[in-house]
């Protein structure tokens, strides 16, 4: 069993982008569902659905590509806060990825949100990952 579900999700998406796969199947947890919803809202993926197989449930992410050469919309994902070294930030010190072109996904007391939402609500939290 994987302990760091967010890192597993990020690695699966990164690997799928390299081989130009259209879908990715990852184990469903509350955290991965919320991160997937954010990726869908921000336009990095086209579809997110939950699939149950026996007693386990999985998330099926449909990745988004552009052009004939199938360039992925997700250029890179980077895990920031890890189980061995948690990284926290208040709302004033949330970093901007590529000058605002990418997003920061945070785990806050209000749930998992993007950097823009956290600044609007003036809440800080644990920086889960960068997406650009």
Swiss-Prot record:
It comes from the Eukaryota. It is found in: Plastid, Chloroplast. GO terms for cellular component: chloroplast; ribonucleoprotein complex; ribosome. InterPro entries: Ribosomal_uS8, Ribosomal_uS8_CS, Ribosomal_uS8_sf. Gene3D superfamilies: 3.30.1370.30, 3.30.1490.10. Pfam families: Ribosomal_S8. The keyword Phosphoprotein does not apply. Part of the 30S ribosomal subunit. PANTHER family: 40S RIBOSOMAL PROTEIN S15A (PTHR11758). Belongs to the universal ribosomal protein uS8 family. One of the primary rRNA binding proteins, it binds directly to 16S rRNA central domain where it helps coordinate assembly of the platform of the 30S subunit. This is Small ribosomal subunit protein uS8c. It comes from Angiopteris evecta.
């Amino acid at each position: 069993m994987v302990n760091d579900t967010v890192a597993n999700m990020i690695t699966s998406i990164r690997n799928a982008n390299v081989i130009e796969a259209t879908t990715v199947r990852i184990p469903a947890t509350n955290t991965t569902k919320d991160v997937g919803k954010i990726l869908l809202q921000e336009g990095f993926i086209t579809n997110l659905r939950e699939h149950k197989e026996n007693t386990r449930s999985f998330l099926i992410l449909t990745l988004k590509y552009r052009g004939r050469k199938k360039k992925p919309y997700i250029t890179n994902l980077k895990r920031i806060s890890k189980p061995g070294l948690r990284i926290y930030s208040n709302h004033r010190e949330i970093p901007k990825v590529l000058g605002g072109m990418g997003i920061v996904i945070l785990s806050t007391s209000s749930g998992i949100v993007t950097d823009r939402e956290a600044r609007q609500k003036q809440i800080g939290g644990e920086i889960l990952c960068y997406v650009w």
